[in-house]
């Protein structure tokens, strides 16, 4: 075996080990959804430094994975409680907690880091609406059984779209509320709630 072949073999073994670690971490986590539809590039990563896997139709996605859509990427996830989550281009988010046992302890906690999602809630929001949370760097969104779109525009995204940076929540049906340390406001169908992004650290 030449030194070049040996190098390639070591590189291949290292890559396989990284993928195996990713699969092991995913296998020991709780699933929250399956990929129902997808176009372009959408990936899921377990940890930092992340080992990402490209998602395909039928793949399972897990609590704790960081999902990221490229600028050409979109996906629809069918959640384990019968709800749907549409991932918009450029979105990044993590589902930190999920339980769907059709009981009062059901819960869903999502951290939206940037970009937009559309969420059609399943039975978690119906059985335990207080256990449903979508958080961004500037606000927390709760629901009362609904179809809504949540966005967090970073400074870069806001400049690109000629909008203000911050959290946006548009309600299609049902009702949500947007909450900060200063209080909360209800958002009805056809309305958009907005909270400015926090100032950069000094």
Feature annotation, model-predicted:
Residues 1-6:
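N-terminal secretory signal peptides that target proteins for export/translocation
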Residues 8-20:
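Bacterial N-terminal signal peptides
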Residues 24-75, 79-200:
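Flexible, surface-exposed loop/linker segments and immediately adjacent secondary-structure boundaries
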